[in-house]
Swiss-Prot record:
Physiological role: Transcription repressor. Interacts specifically with the W box (5'-(T)TGAC[CT]-3'), a frequently occurring elicitor-responsive cis-acting element. Regulates, probably indirectly, the activation of defense-related genes during defense response. Negatively regulates basal innate immunity and XA21-mediated defense against X.oryzae pv. oryzae (Xoo).
Domain characteristics, as noted in the entry: The WRKY domain is required to bind DNA.
Top-level taxon in the UniProt lineage: Eukaryota
GO molecular function: ATP binding; DNA-binding transcription factor activity; sequence-specific DNA binding
Family the entry assigns: Belongs to the WRKY group II-a family.
Lineage: Eukaryota, Viridiplantae, Streptophyta, Embryophyta, Tracheophyta
Protein's organism: Oryza sativa subsp. indica (Rice)
UniProt xrefs under Pfam families: WRKY
GO cellular component: nucleus
Protein name: WRKY transcription factor WRKY62
Amino acid sequence: MDDDGDGSSSPTDDSAAAGLLPLFSRSPAEDLEEKLRRAMEENARLTRALDAILAGHHAHQRALLAPSLSPPPPSATARAPSVSTSCAAREDAAPAVAAAAASTACPSRQQPPTAEPRPKVRTVRVRADAADATDANSMAETVKDGYQWRKYGQKVTRDNPYPRAYFRCAFAPSCPVKKKLQRCAEDRSMLVATYEGEHNHALSTQTTEFVASGCTTSQHAGGSSSSPLPCSISINSSGRTITLDLTNQAGSGSIASCGVEAAAVSGELVTVLSPELRRHLVEEVVQVLKNDAEFVEAVTNAVAARVVDQIPHIPVHL
């Protein structure tokens, strides 16, 4: 029996001797499953942590936006009428004290000072006989605009040897329009009338009939319509200067005179002219613009740019 006991061996020794794996070892597939399970648990834990962070962020955001979304307390709304009421009471009590209080207690009621508008200025040039007298009354009779004027001054300027006369509209006491009348220093036969401001009254019936009758009679007193009209035009940089010739025959001169009168009455040099004078003025303007090299160049560049813009763009493939 001893021999049998000594020669016997356990099953574990037999399996080890045979080179078999132990019973508790795992296969590679089981290792991968274990790693996947651990990764899923870590992912779930991180998801819960992220949800908690987002919940805290939303809570802080709602806490910050709550004051701006909530209505103002009743005390603040009740305080605003009291401030306006106190300002009104101060103004009723003492105007001087109210002005000082408004500058300190009510700054919102202050308004920035606005710049005063500059008076509108327009110039009319009338060609007259150079042999006429240079006194203000003669010049005023030459430039007829349909208004009544009162002379209030005269002086000689440094750049012109001829005196400049100052007139004020006498049609209405409150009319702010002023007129300056002076002979041109370069051309003695040219009278320059400068108007400042706009009339705040309407034309009288006599003045309206005077201007209308002048335009009507000029169309019939000018003789043949084929004769050249005694009108020349010159345009300055601002486009507010027109020159009319009044030195030729009476009939054609009345047409130009009518243009000056209507120009001064309208205040914008836009007149009710006869068709012949209007056509002649258009021809003069076209001639002046054609002789202006800068204007022609500007029009040429604008037309060229317009033509280039209309050409369709064709891509070039090299």
